[in-house]
Design a protein with these regions (language model features):
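Central regulatory/effector-binding core of bacterial HTH transcription factors
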Residues: 2-62
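Short, well-ordered beta-strand segments
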Residues: 7-9, 54, 99, 143, ...
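Residue-level recognition of the GNAT/N-acetyltransferase active site
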Residues: 11, 80, 177
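Short, surface-exposed acidic/glycine-rich loop or hinge patches that mediate macromolecular interfaces
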Residues: 13, 101, 179-180
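C-terminal regulatory
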Residues: 44, 48, 60-169, 196-197
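A late-sequence structural motif
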Residues: 165-197
Length: 197
């Protein structure tokens, strides 16, 4: 039969940190599905892009959207290994540039949980977490991001996690508009994705 096209929007961090290295397996298991991947910075608009699915980060409470929980992804500060010595205690973040994403409250949530005193998140704003973490690797500042999505960089010693504390502000979800009837290709992708996590 003809190829079935499947269009999936995915936030960049999840694409790079999890999905891309596993897509080979999906393609070999489903050779008749042509997967179109649209990477989005942090926000995915299901209706505007006529996406079949969107993989996004949040609490899962989106209106008129069917959301399947993929995984939790707690956030923790990440920085260049060269900054580790300067970061013995959460209060030490006072002297650092704190790189921020469009999710403005995330740093406050972590700093509160860490009991950090007198630390104000001041630093450049990024619209893509993956780019923000890249900037942190170059020593631009400290990023707040899910370590589980940057396991490779942490293992290779290109990135460091100065504190064990991670704060849970959301996770990754597979979402579709409730008004959209799932196609066989969509169901195949959903079954595959929820099984590999």
């Amino acid at each position: 039969g003809p190829m079935e096209v499947l269009t999936v929007g995915v936030v960049g961090t999840f694409a790079v940190g999890f999905l891309l290295e596993r897509l080979v397996r999906f393609r070999s298991e489903h050779p008749r599905i042509e997967l179109r991947l649209l990477t989005h910075n942090n926000k995915v608009d299901l209706s505007a892009e006529s996406l079949d699915y969107a993989i996004q980060f949040g609490d899962g409470a989106w209106r008129s959207v069917q959301a399947d929980h993929i995984m939790v992804a707690p956030l923790s500060p990440l920085c260049a290994p060269s900054l580790l010595e300067q970061l013995q205690h959460p209060d030490d973040l006072r002297t650092q540039r704190l790189l921020r994403s469009y999710r403005g409250q995330d740093w406050q949530a972590w700093l509160r949980a860490a009991g950090a005193k007198g630390v104000t998140p001041r630093g450049p704003l990024f619209d893509a977490s993956a780019i923000m973490v890249q900037a942190a690797m170059f020593g631009e500042g400290v990023a707040l991001a899910p370590p589980c999505m940057f396991a490779r960089e942490l293992q290779q010693g290109r990135l460091a996690q100065p504190f064990d504390l991670a704060v849970d502000v959301g996770g990754y979800w597979l979402t579709r508009l409730m008004s959209k009837e799932p196609t066989p290709a969509m169901l195949a992708f959903r079954t595959w994705l929820l099984a590999v996590v």
